[in-house]
Amino acid sequence: MTGWESKSDNGQTHAINLGFAKTTGEIMAWINSDDIILPGTLSYIADYFNRHPKIDVVYGNRIQIDINDKQIGRWILPEHDNNVLSWTDFVPQETLYWRRSIWEKVGGRLDESFRFAMDWDFLVRLRDAGARFARLPRFMGGFRVHPKQKTSSEIGDIGLQEMNDIRLRLIGKIPTEREIFKAVKPYLIKHSFTDLIWRIRNAFGNPY
């Protein structure tokens, strides 16, 4: 760690922007205070970017943990799908990393009008700027689940409104849940298949 600052701000997104304004590195990410980066991830990401200079954005699988750091679930994702991003955000934020060059290309800031869906908005802006994504077959982050987290308490009001605003912008309307499910169903099938393959390999001592 090369710096630390604690002061009043205008919300989480503003605070993240303040932090990024002080950075100089070529690989960028943020981590929320509840969540964790899994051991070995940073060196793995640095090596991957060095070996794949044409990739702009990467993310990976997540584990879910409780307040005692006990693992309570997993997200094992299929290959990246740009089209699905118009309908929903499937990228685990705590596993997301990108190059500074693509950050600067999209303006070098998160949109501070978002309190909840700033990461989804950011992903869409990256996609629309031509960013090349890669989903990496590795558990890279841990997402903490507890009753008082912002994700749980506000998704029913502010979060839902922000997500609908993004969908309206991208597809021209606010779709029904049925329409969303129909649009993302092929991805969900791939998700289930990828999860099954992982469990089979893991059962035989060969997880990827």
Question: Where do the model's predicted regions map?
Answer:
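Conserved donor NDP-sugar-binding/catalytic core segment of glycosyltransferases
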Residues: 40-72
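Glycine-rich, basic loop-to-helix element that forms the pyrophosphate-binding segment
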Residues: 7-23
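The conserved acidic donor/metal-binding loop of glycosyltransferases
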Residues: 32-36, 61
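Conserved donor sugar-nucleotide recognition element shared by glycan-biosynthetic enzymes
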Residues: 12-16, 41, 94
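Short glycine/serine/threonine-enriched helix-capping/active-site loop
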Residues: 7, 57-62, 136, 143
